[in-house]
Every structure is written in C-alpha cells, then in structure tokens.
Amino acid sequence: VTTIALARVADFAALGERWRMLEAQADCSFFQSWTWTGCLAAERFPDPVLLEASQAGDTVALALFNRRRFLLRQTLLLGETGDGVHDTPYIEYNGVLTARRAGDILRDCLRAARRLPVAGMRPWLLRQLVMSSVEDATVEAARAVGRVAIRNSSPAPSIDLARLRESG
C-alpha cells in the first residue's frame, strides 16, 4: 500500500538529506538530484510543497513543487518557480524522484498533487500541474489525472563520446 502526502517545506537542509537517501535508490537524472533541485532552494521555492510517497514506512517518491495562487486556483510547478529569472537555468530531465522498487506509482503521485490538502488546507478547485521537460511516461500520467500544462520540452542534445571513439 502506498501512502502519499503533501506538506510545506520548513527545513531544506533536512529535506536534502532525505532526498539524497532516495537518490541512491533511484535511477534519476542530474536534474532530479538534490545537487540541482536543492541549489538555492529557499530562494527558488518561495511557497514550496513537498510530495512524499511511502510504502511500508519507507519513502519511495519525492517531488518538490512551487505553489502559485491566483484567486481560488492553485498551480503546482514541478521543480521550478514559474518566474523566468529563477528558471533561466533550464531544467532538462525533470520528474518525480522515484525509488526503483516503488512500482508504477507516478499516476497516483500526480493525482495526489492535484487533490490532497497542504497543511490541512484542501484546494477549492483541483490544482493545475505545470511541468517542463518531463519524460513521456510523466506526461501520460499527468494527462490521465487531469489538468496539466507542459512547458518547455527541449532536452539538450548529447553525444556518447565512448561510443563515438569506438566507432572510429
């Protein structure tokens, strides 16, 4: 059984320790690591919301969102601020940090992000999710649970130098 909760972040240093522990159990991109996510986190996330999924008491997924509010509507931005100045260092391979052993919980995590209360306050309207540069599986899971906006989606090209050298 997977338990999912949303909470405000009060201590980024403590979150960083937990995040790095989960990183060791995940196949994640650099852009999902605490090195990227935690860099200037207090400045980049003025209204941070942490999604945490656990199974048998162990954390199996974490996602750091920034919450933006406009009237009754709340928006959660995955791994970004929504502010062009702070989001200029562009995230390329974004997503929910998930342990290898967690199974297929992505859809449940994103559904929870739209619906669950934060600090005891349930949203008046279902939240919109905003994501940039997420994998196709994340896009599909997000669209399956409702309103989602996919922003920038242009990962930087890369070359496998070892393979290039081998080919001559």
List each model region and its residues.
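N-acyltransferase acceptor-side catalytic subdomain
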Residues: V1-G168
